[in-house]
Amino acid sequence: MRYVRLCVISLLATLPLVVYAGPQPLEQIKQSESQLSGRVGMVEMDLANGRTLAAWRADERFPMVSTFKVLLCGAVLARVDAGLEQLDRRIHYRQQDLVDYSPVSEKHLVDGMTIGELCAAAITLSDNSAGNLLLATVGGPAGLTAFLRQIGDNVTRLDRWETALNEALPGDARDTTTPASMAATLRKLLTAQHLSARSQQQLLQWMVDDRVAGPLIRAVLPPGWFIADKTGAGERGARGIVALLGPDGKPERIVVIYLRDTPASMAERNQHIAGIGQR
């Protein structure tokens, strides 16, 4: 697919650096920031070559909220590829291991869940207890952060477990990423040698099967477009989505959008993310 030549715009020091393919994405984001009374971060990246197609506040920190679960399952799959884990290994847990919003894991206190089932629950339904159970297998938040450093992400960090990681305090670097780092790391997981082809396809399929992202970019995509995504939401207006998109049913680009520090309702945040992500 042909893309217009990228433009690099130097703004005043008080404004974020913007790289963009045309005026529409920038104008939509500026309008959203004004209406939300908060901050928006966005990166659109070519999946094949890693070129940045559009960006706004690309290097500013935003709470990952539940978008971290894609990275977590990437770390789990890396352990599977290394022979250190098996997707069919069953984990048993107790009532006291459950945290708020565990729609799948709360139903399996008797029989437990496999690693693969936990990843599916964590990504497709954002099950928080599934996320914590998986975090324990990779060494907790510090273990996931170490994995990210190993694959070249020196920015993204996870410091806490669900649900404390959704606190999203202003100025707090804990449990944050930047849009640029998240996009680059997701691309590494899906295209580089950090995961086997089989694991890459599995991670992508879990994102394709996402069942809680309907009101966001999925709501505004043209017919026939591919989408695989993972959303997140937290306190103080935190909201986010990481997605792969493309026409003709093929993933061609990565889109990362984060919001923070806004008093807007969930419905309003969803609407703005959909508007920014609209093709």
From Swiss-Prot:
EC number(s) per entry: 3.5.2.6
Protein name: Beta-lactamase
GO biological process, one term: response to antibiotic
Top-rank lineage group of the source organism: Bacteria
Positions of the catalytic residues: 66
Ligand binding (substrate): 230-232
Note: The class A beta-lactamase family has a specific amino-acid numbering system, sometimes called Ambler or ABL numbering and often misspelt as Amber. A multiple sequence alignment was used to derive a consensus sequence and then the consensus was numbered taking into account insertions and deletions. This allows use of identical numbers, e.g. for active site residues, despite differences in protein length. UniProt always uses natural numbering of residues, hence there appear to be differences in numbering between this entry and some papers.
Gene3D superfamilies referenced in this protein's UniProt entry, alphabetically: DD-peptidase/beta-lactamase superfamily
UniProt key word Glycosyltransferase: no
Signal sequence region: 1-21
Species for this entry: Klebsiella pneumoniae
